[in-house]
A protein has these predicted regions:
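N-terminal hydrophobic/helix-forming segments and targeting peptides
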Residues: 1-335
């Protein structure tokens, strides 16, 4: 599949809403696409989607998670404002004034709090989520309850934009990037491998924990998005944009298989596919579940460097996106 087609697929995926536990929109898109292309799939009770392509799919499995970080409605005030809680890891200080969509009714809202110029000095410290509210334009609790209920998921509202020198801005690039790469490979119908689209990664890799006991891949690759530190200032080294996909050594949930990592690094270098090492060990991903079941599966993590991840304006490079596809394609050929 050509890069322009993959970028269009990524655009379509990022415009879908799927916080952890509410992955239906992405799952339905995948199921519709797979069905239209006569690609068999399975879906387990937790919503994970498994595709086993070709005659020997257990050679290698590729993983990507469908969910994104977001929020849930935890209360409705008497004045019609919504109280909310995070779903996944979200930083409080990026939220004020961001537009959101609430629930299946797609109610528009804005995250707000007391304006800075009206706050007393004692309130000048960073505002936390419990002190914020979502304004949906309701005049009362009764008015708000006509379209919103406690427990409704809340999503960021953000356009997909190509800008600058080959950059992409969107919400949910973590991990619609991985989903787009794997789906693109499936649609070629050229390769034998297992594809796994997992749920609930952002709240403790729950989907991967459930799906792995029924799989038996000889090797695995988790496709992800990670932080990058390529802007001016004193930042912890992580990855750099436009320098290729990042290969993890270890993180907070797993240690990558050394021999598998060495193979990946060598073959990427041989084929002139840009690759770098991820220098930070923070965070975790589905590899934390994939590595340690079925007697142990040699697992590697390939991550795309992303600026401002877990926000409505995450940014990636088109060339890095292409590098991930090319390397994943090479691995399912050569593993």
């Amino acid at each position: 599949m050509e890069i322009t087609q993959r970028i269009e697929l990524l655009k379509n995926l990022t415009q879908l809403n799927a916080t952890s536990g509410y992955e239906d929109e992405v799952a339905e898109f995948l199921i519709k696409t797979l069905s239209e292309n006569e690609i068999p799939y399975q879906q387990d009770p937790l919503g994970n989607i498994i595709v086993q392509m070709g005659e020997n799919p257990d050679r290698i499995a590729l993983f990507a998670h469908m969910d994104e970080v977001g929020f849930g409605v935890r209360g409705i005030r008497e004045d019609g404002m919504l109280k909310f809680a995070p779903i996944g890891g979200v930083t409080d200080n990026i939220l004020f004034s961001t537009p959101v969509v609430v629930g299946n009714n797609r109610v528009s809202g804005i995250i707000g709090n007391i304006p800075k110029h009206l706050q007393e000095k004692k309130s000048e410290q960073e505002t936390k989520i419990p002190d914020m509210m979502i304004d949906i334009g309701a005049t009362s609790k009764k008015d708000a309850e006509k379209s919103v209920k406690i427990g409704d998921p809340i999503y960021w509202l953000s356009d997909f934009v190509r800008f600058g020198d080959g950059l992409i801005k969107a919400k949910a690039l973590d991990d619609r990037v991985g989903v787009a790469v794997i789906l693109s490979l499936l649609l070629t119908k050229q390769y034998s491998f297992t594809a796994v689209f997992t749920t609930r990664e952002e709240i403790g890799i729950m989907g991967a924990r459930m799906v792995m006991p029924v799989l038996a891949p000889k090797k695995a690759v988790v496709l992800e998005v990670t932080t990058c530190a390529d802007l001016p200032g004193n930042q912890e080294p992580t990855t750099k944009m436009r320098e290729g996909v990042a290969l993890s050594v270890l993180d907070g949930a797993s240690v990558s298989d050394t021999e598998w990592n060495q193979f990946i690094w060598a073959i990427a270098t041989e084929k002139n596919i840009p690759i770098q090492k991820k220098l930070t060990t923070r965070g975790g991903n589905d590899a934390g579940a994939v590595s340690y079941v079925s007697g142990g599966v040699p697992t590697a993590v390939l991550s795309l460097p992303g600026r401002y991840i877990h926000s409505p304006v995450s940014v990636i490079s088109e060339t890095d996106f292409d590098s991930m596809y090319r390397l994943a394609e090479l691995l399912i050929k050569k593993a």
